[in-house]
Regions:
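Solvent-exposed, low-complexity, repeat-rich "mucin-like" stalks and linkers
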Residues: 36-75, 221-239
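Bacterial signal peptide processing site
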Residues: 29-31
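C-terminal motif of bacterial Sec signal peptides marking the signal peptidase cleavage site
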Residues: 24-27
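Loop/helix patches that line or flank the sugar-binding groove of alpha-linked glycan CAZymes
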Residues: 315, 331-350, 600-601, 607-774
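Aromatic-rich carbohydrate-binding modules that target alpha-glucans
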Residues: 116-176, 184-211, 244-264
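Active-site-proximal helices and loops of the catalytic beta/alpha 8
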Residues: 37-39, 44-47, 436, 446, ...
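Substrate-binding/active-site clefts of carbohydrate-active enzymes
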Residues: 318, 328-514, 534-546, 562-564
């Protein structure tokens, strides 16, 4: 389908403005008869869609193009205008789309690169709180609102005092939002709203539903592939529903997409045969709403239908195992250096795990037998000696060693207690020889006070003190980008270009020089996007482009979907952990005050926020949470201090039903879009309260019957997931069949996978007809 180059008919504006800004044309469209996908080296990866802001949206050309200065023109959809800042290669886009989605066309050397844009669908809602006697003496910002829409940040949204009420207008995306008022520092419910839901810690939050406008768009559905593997058939769409079909980053020409009343036929381009892996992406919307999206992988130009064609860098098919190096396996006793101090409890000290222990597990097939193709290692950079911090809420008190690795005293050198540089390389070589990816947990937000860079460049760090002389520690939301995690952990000023340039060079060492396949980034929301954008550009230029390697970066952010999504995109992160979905899944599977309807709502909200084929991490637990199985068994409660629980009582072996609940959690995570993540020990049901009790030593044998059964069930799930195009790339439908039963359907070119989760003690029966199953379904 190679066609001659036809340039679009454009009216160009070349008038220069102050600061190097250029106003670009907005109204013309490229000639659909011309289609030129370029040379293939202009971009790295897929150009992820952009959700436009209500005001101005900054679109960084360098997020998408290796040489952004080579872009010679852009055609923006009707309703948008853009001002270009040449010194930063940023388009400042204003206006509003006329439709829920449209496409911007970037032209470079005769080729069009097409970026999908989403209209901002936020709707303003007015919140009011009644005036109180004597409130004229209150501060002007005495009444505030916190909720899922502002990441529960007490300093984000203040109400204005009026004649009879305090009032504020808040933009909210469609869906259910939880909130409370904060009046003079005290959290209070909305007296005018009786709708409330449990907050997971013993109380309730108000809830408000923002309804979507208009009727739903008809969902996109794959039907079939022809014998050549190069023509796709989809279910038909209404005539008024917009359809956008991209191969890689190029909208296919009109003659390649044929719509009739009965079907949609898509002819794949000849150029696809030249690439071992490429992708077709399909988007659609009616006048008011977007539909789901489709992501279809191609193997040398043919639709990928066989699971054995999936490779380890097909991240949609990744299964991720997270281990804490010090607590996993001791492969080299010669590097054991516990503090053995009376002021450090054993659970807060080094216990001997190291990289040789990880290599031992790799070489004996531990991860492969469990079905995992990706391993995430806790940080291994050099950390300080000695003991730091203090736990004094229970007796005995304890200080902490740096066994966990999150206090970097070097950003580039491995900690000798975990291994030498050659042992790092040996671990990676062993993993890659067995087709395993390895991600490194990396800390960019802060350093330890013994780090040489803090001593040499103190101006690169934020102040420990606020303007009122109070400590700026653990202010996670009020001072998100400047707060210190502790007084001995200086916070990097990631808005300082000089600091960012140097410290991203250090981060690059682990992927470029050692060969890690990507990162898990610690404390993502506390780091400015300048850092993430700079690091990602370096990765593209120095690793991904020259090696043709698809890397993966996943971040850690606790907050609203909007905050989490603000760190995602072609120039930023590939994914983050979906903690909001974890909370809902925990509540449902462990039977902790979340029903099936709520779980469906949160899952649907995640798909809307991150896309239907996102790479978000769906976790069974992590190093900062109580073990799922102990919560499910009632041994630890969410409304208590879950860290103190681990110091004051023994959290023992759970009952049989808790293993079943954990199995359900795993089944949920392995069935939905995103990457299933198993925290070490969760495959067999390791118990524990919160940190450090959730970081017990791993065991590799002597499983109880319940542990062994769970471990085998997880292995079946993971092995199926890694070889299932349906679970990696299929469409998703979620139904709450009752308050206790959830159905998840994934479908991909005629193949369906159904997962039915029933948390009740009563069996639920379905007929083949009810589930629309083929009689020969297995």
């Amino acid at each position: 389908m190679k066609a001659p180059v036809v340039r679009p008919s454009l009216t160009r504006f070349a008038a220069a403005f102050a600061g190097g800004a250029v106003l670009l044309a907005t109204a013309c469209s490229p000639d659909p008869a011309g289609w030129n996908p370029g040379d293939g080296d202009e971009t790295v990866g897929l150009m992820t869609p952009v959700l436009l802001n209500a005001g101005t949206t900054a679109i960084y050309s360098g997020d998408y193009f290796l040489e952004p200065e080579e872009v010679d023109s852009v055609v923006w959809p009707d309703g948008l205008r853009a001002e270009y800042k040449a010194d930063s290669a940023v388009y400042r886009v204003t206006g509003a789309l006329k439709k829920p989605l449209d496409v911007a066309h970037f032209w470079m050397a005769g080729a069009s690169f097409d970026l999908v844009l989403y209209a901002n669908g936020a709707q303003y809602r007015t919140f009011t709180y009644p005036r109180q006697p004597g409130d004229t003496a209150w501060a002007e910002d005495a009444v505030r609102i916190i909720g899922t829409f502002n990441a529960w940040n007490r300093s984000a949204t203040a109400l204005k005092r009026g004649d009879s009420t305090w009032t504020v207008d808040v933009p909210l995306f469609p869906g259910n939002h939880e909130y409370k008022f904060v009046v003079n520092g005290v959290e209070l419910l909305d007296p005018s709203n009786s709708r409330a839901v449990p907050n997971g810690i013993g109380g309730v939050n108000n809830t408000l539903e923002v309804k979507r406008e208009g009727l739903p768009a008809r969902p996109l559905k794959t039907r079939s592939v022809d014998e050549s593997g190069s023509q796709i058939t989809l279910a038909p769409l209404p005539k008024n529903q917009k359809l956008v079909v991209l191969w890689e980053n190029h909208a296919l020409p009109a003659d390649a997409v044929v719509q009739t009343e009965n079907s949609i036929r898509i002819q794949l381009p000849d150029e696809a045969a030249d690439l071992p892996r490429s992708f077709v992406r399909i988007y659609s919307a009616n006048a008011h709403r977007r539909s789901n999206d489709l992501l279809i992988p191609l193997e040398k130009g043919r639709v990928l239908l066989q699971g054995d064609l999936l490779q380890r860098h097909d991240w949609e098919a990744a299964t991720l195992y997270f281990l804490m190096v010090d607590r996993f396996a001791n492969g080299d006793p010669s590097n054991d250096r516990p503090l053995n101090r009376p002021d450090v409890l054993p659970q807060a000290d080094f216990q001997g795990g190291d990289l040789d222990g990880v290599t031992w597990a790799i070489q004996r097939g531990f991860f492969e037998k469990l079905g995992f193709n990706t391993v995430w290692l806790s940080p291994i950079a050099r950390n300080p000696q000695g003991a730091w911090g203090l736990w004094d809420k229970t007796v005995p008190n304890t200080k902490f060693s740096a066994y966990h690795g999150y206090w970097p005293a070097s950003n580039t050198q491995p900690d000798a207690r975990f291994g030498r540089p050659d042992q790092v390389r040996n671990t990676l070589a062993s993993a890659h020889s067995r087709n395993l990816n390895v991600l490194l947990d990396y800390v960019g937000n802060h350093v330890h006070e013994e780090h040489p860079v803090y001593r040499a460049k103190p101006q690169w760090f934020n102040s420990l003190y606020l303007p009122d002389s109070s400590l700026n520690t653990e202010k996670w939301d009020e001072y998100r980008l400047t707060t210190w995690f502790d007084t001995f952990l200086p916070d990097v000023n990631t808005e300082n270009p000089e600091a960012v340039a140097a410290l991203t060079d250090s981060a690059l060492v682990w992927v470029r020089d050692y060969g890690f396949d990507g990162y898990r980034h610690d404390a993502t929301k506390h780091v400015a996007n300048l850092y993430w954008r700079t690091l990602t550009q370096k990765l593209k230029h120095q690793v991904a482009a020259p090696r043709g390697q698809r890397l993966y970066q996943i971040g850690e952010t606790y907050g609203s979907p909007e905050l989490i999504a603000s760190y995602l995109g072609s120039g930023l992160m590939d994914a983050q952990f979906d903690f909001n979905l974890y909370d809902a899944a925990l509540g449902f599977c462990a039977n902790l005050n979340t029903d099936a309807t709520r779980l469906k709502e949160v899952l649907d909200a995640s798909l809307a926020a991150y896309g239907h084929h996102h790479l978000m991490g769906n976790i069974s637990g992590n190093q900062d949470k109580p073990r799922f199985i102990s919560l499910a068994n009632g041994d630890v409660r969410l409304d208590e201090d879950t860290k103190a629980a681990g110091y004051t009582r023994k959290i023992g072996t759970p009952g049989a039903s808790a293993y079943q609940k954990l199995a359900m959690m795993h089944a949920f995570n392995f069935s939905i879009p995103g990457i299933p993540v198993v925290y070490y020990g969760d495959e067999y049901g390791m118990p524990g309260a919160n940190d450090p009790d959730n970081r017990r030593l791993m065991k590799f044998k002597n499983y109880t019957p319940e542990e062994d059964k769970l471990r085998k069930e997880v292995a079946k799930l993971a092995q199926f997931r890694t070889k299932s195009p349906v679970l990696a790339y299929g469409s998703t439908t979620v139904k709450a069949l009752s308050k206790n039963v959830v159905l998840i359907e994934r479908s991909y070119f005629g193949e369906r996978v159904l997962t039915i989760l029933n948390r009740s003690n009563q069996p639920v029966k379905f007929t083949v007809k009810q589930l629309q199953l083929h009689p020969k379904t297995r």
